[in-house]
């Protein structure tokens, strides 16, 4: 019975709290900000490698066959 009463009181408390009254909002904003930076860094790293591979492919054109 104590568990049920505690659970109900906690549920009511959670439902009555406004979203801006806790620290979770700033936590999620900071997490999203960090996620954007990490994603951008990963994409830049991936595309940087990709561009170097494309440069090599242009330099060594497989369609040109030269016999020496």
Swiss-Prot record:
Keyword Secreted: yes
More details: The peptide is disordered in aqueous solution.
Topology in membrane: Peripheral membrane protein
Organism: Pseudopleuronectes americanus
Similarity annotation: Belongs to the pleurocidin family.
UniProt tissue specificity: Goblet cells.
Record's signal peptide: 1-22
A Gene Ontology cellular-component term: extracellular region
A GO BP annotation: defense response to bacterium
Compartments, record wording: Secreted; Membrane
Protein purpose: Antimicrobial peptide with potent activity against Gram-positive and Gram-negative bacteria. Activity against E.coli and B.subtilis. Weaker activity against L.mucor, s.marcescens and P.aeruginosa. May play a role in innate host defense.
Main location, first listed in the record: secreted
The keyword Secreted appears for this protein: yes
Protein name: Pleurocidin
Maturation propeptide residues: 48-68
Any GO MF annotation of the entry: lipid binding
Keyword terms of this UniProt record: Antibiotic, Antimicrobial, Lipid-binding, Membrane, Secreted, Signal
